[in-house]
Amino acid sequence: MAVVSVDDLTIAYGNHTVIDHLSFSINEGDFLVVVGENGVGKTTLVRSMLGFLKPKSGTISIPQSTRLGYVPQFRNIDEEYPLSIRDFVALNTKPRLLPWLTKSEQNRVEQMIRENNLTKIAERPLGLASGGEKQRAYLAQALLPNPNLLILDESTASLDNEMKYELLDLVTRFQQNGLSVMFITHDWDLAEQYGTRFLYLSPGSYSTGPINELPSPIKGDKK
């Protein structure tokens, strides 16, 4: 069953077409890697899927049963940011009038803290966390409301190799339990190692399929 279906999607900025007649779907349990050079529309596609950008034509069909989670590449959080990692994760609880968390919400926060390897640093101010720790906190926050589709927008770009693998190993653990993942990346090695399917965007065209069908010319274009 598809958690997202994109059909004949065209997105343009003025007279400049960024995405042209794109069609693909993400099914339950997919780990879709989206690859391509800068400027081919990867982030534009994400912004449109999140509802921030209206396409020129085509459709993005997201069933009511699909719940989106999103982890960006970067957030402007400096050393003075006051919240602990635990409190930051808890920010993604359902808005309501009560100023405190229910018992079930507290349990869910602790579950995400534990499952994202944050227990030992949960009281650390987020502003003092390392890049990898921050990304795990962003992941825990995104997963708190139990989404079934997680979008990672260049979420490993600023991390060293060890932290990249740690983050994606965590994501894969959730994916193997049914989470669908859409991972935008420039890292071809990560794409091939973690993806189950690929979407390759290039100027004016695209290709998609199982990760083992990633065309050889694209593999030779690694950076």
List each model region and its residues.
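H-loop (His-switch) and adjacent beta-strand-loop-beta switch element
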Residues: 196-211
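Catalytic Walker B motif of ABC-type/P-loop ATPase nucleotide-binding domains
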Residues: 150-153
